[in-house]
UniProtKB/Swiss-Prot annotation:
The gene is rps1. Keywords: Acetylation, Cytoplasm, Ribonucleoprotein, Ribosomal protein. Residues 1-18 have a biased composition (Basic residues). InterPro entries: Ribosomal_eS1, Ribosomal_eS1_CS, Ribosomal_eS1_euk. It comes from Aspergillus fumigatus (strain ATCC MYA-4609 / CBS 101355 / FGSC A1100 / Af293) (Neosartorya fumigata). This is Small ribosomal subunit protein eS1.
Length: 256
């Protein structure tokens, strides 16, 4: 009988099987808070590795960017086609305090706006707010039929497009440069700038679907904790001291 390896015999494995550790057991859950400019403050939860050694959990959270639907932040389905970017600037306890980082349209909404027989007009401008945030605003507009128009097409002439674009840049520059980032966010939510452009260009060519389709944050000023806490409806520690009334008792030394 040939001597060889019998595969049927069960043989003990070398070494001990390594115990698998659940990666989520090393993570902590933090709440993401939106600024007070939005109706719904609780954005959601985010996970981060627990602080260990030189790795701090707060450092891992700062700078994270979350993309949230404006419909969820405003509790209104009419804003479902707009997305807001929020950046974590500060961590307090288990809360991540965020600030506005940008705005964008969903792809399906942009595709649905582009149609035949009309002119598309786009404009963009780089502007600095009063609190030194450098932003780039992108606007989009479409021509529409005049009242009692029989002609099917609504194409604007090149001179009219240039005049409309000039107006769009002027209005965006004026509206954004005269306010802070929080005030600009208040204007962007109800689309105040879009309506202003539509009204101002009525004499050149009637427009429809005028939107600020994108807001890009190019440069932020030096981080100010007090400004961020005010934005979240919180305040820093009060500098003024409070008078403490205390009964003064003169210390009597016993004679030696």
């Amino acid at each position: 009988m040939a001597v060889g390896k019998n595969k049927r015999l069960s043989k003990g494995k070398k070494g001990v099987k390594k115990r698998t550790v659940d990666p989520f057991s090393r993570k902590d859950e933090y709440s993401v808070k939106a600024p007070s400019t939005f109706q719904i403050r609780d954005v959601g939860k985010t996970l981060v590795n627990r602080t260990s050694g030189l790795k701090n959990a707060n450092d891992s959270l700062k700078g994270r960017i979350f993309e949230v639907s404006l419909a969820d932040l405003q509790n209104d389905e009419d804003h479902a086609f707009r997305k807001v970017k929020l950046r974590v600037d500060e961590v307090q306890g288990k809360n991540c305090l965020t600030n506005f980082h940008g705005l964008d349209f969903t792809t399906d909404k942009l595709r649905s706006l582009v149609r035949k027989w009309q002119s598309l007009i786009e404009a963009n401008v780089t502007v600095k707010t009063t609190d030194d945030y450098l932003l780039r605003l992108f606007a989009i507009a479409f021509t529409k039929r005049r009242p009692n128009q029989i002609k099917k097409t609504t194409y604007a002439r090149s001179s009219q497009i240039r005049a409309i674009r000039k107006k769009m840049i002027e209005i965006m520059q004026r509206e954004a440069a005269s306010c802070s980032l929080a005030q600009l966010t208040h204007k962007l939510i109800p689309e105040v700038i879009g309506r202003e452009i539509e009204k101002a260009t009525q004499g050149i060519y009637p427009l429809q679907n005028v939107h600020i389709r994108k807001v890009k944050l190019l440069k932020a000023p030096k981080f100010d904790l007090g400004a961020l806490l005010n934005l979240h409806g919180e305040s820093t520690t009060d500098d003024k001291g409070h008078k403490v009334e205390r009964e003064f008792k003169e210390q009597v030394l016993e004679s030696v």
